[in-house]
Amino acid sequence: MINRLKITAVLVLLFSLNLSGQTKKEIFDYLKTLGHGKYLFGQMATWVHNENPDMDDSTNWIRKIHDHTGIYPRYACITYDYDDDPFTDAQWNEGVKKLHDRGFIAGVYNFYANPCGGRWNSPVTLDPIFEDGDNAIKADFYKQMDRMAANMQWLKDNGITVIYTPFVELDDKNKWHAKEGSRNGIRLYRLVHDYFTKKGLDNIIWAFHTTQRPGALQEYYPGDEYVDIIGKSAYGSGLIFNEYEWAVEKKRSSGKVIWWGELGIRDQKDEPRDCFDVLTKLETSFPELAGFSFWSDAGFYNVVDNLNGPKFMADPKLVTLKKR
């Protein structure tokens, strides 16, 4: 009986230690150590459409990456798509939980539906969201926030910290949230942040990123008190990060983590590219970045349809699931 109790105590201790490594502080402090020869390998698991949040499903990009390389990324991100709504909240939540349980650093994107009633790229009038009193646009967006807050609470109750991006590319005027410019884009980000924080959702590492447009990071920056991770998209052959020096200053002066929030290493019309170009660019131009997250949607963005993917993921400078 005593031996059984000892074994149980050890198992509980090990379980607790595992959870302690998944707290917000533990994960964020770890991310701060990256860069300069050690870079996080991330991958979008799902974007929108019908990419299944279960990492073992054939449509999930974590499965596709592993099938191609035999290696799992360290960071994986699932999108809660409220525009098309192809899955239930329970399916998205369970997808994030499976990532967490398998040892991934879990990310969550939101793709909020247009609160004015149109599609994701339809015109909007957003000021009513911030007005006193009730109105239909405000009610719609608050309903969506309540829905997502309930999901975040479920994740918190299950001991899961996530890197959360409330608005994908905050400056992207193809999307409804940016159609009225930086003023309301910033207000939306701050609103979600404050609303979730007041609900006690302290399992969130707050991520902000923009398109690769020059100057977008400064123009749309919500503020130091609202952002933990600053990111930039980079698509095509350039592998650019225009505001790198500004971002490095934020890293040094305000303790921010900086990375490529979205990365696609070539266009569809281009010939397959050597994946090691990413590592070369990091080492020679952007060594302060903590890493990157490859885009999904199609293999030409990531290691699946480019050259030396398995070798690239096995490189000791890249942090994958088994190399921490």
Where are the predicted features?
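Bacterial Sec-dependent N-terminal signal peptides
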Residues: 1-22
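Alpha-helical scaffolding within the catalytic cores
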Residues: 25-27, 54-65, 90-94, 148-151, ...
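Substrate-binding cleft of secreted/luminal carbohydrate-active enzymes
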Residues: 35-46, 263-324
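Aromatic-lined carbohydrate-recognition surfaces of secreted/lumenal glycan-active proteins
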Residues: 43-44, 165-171, 189-216, 257-268, ...
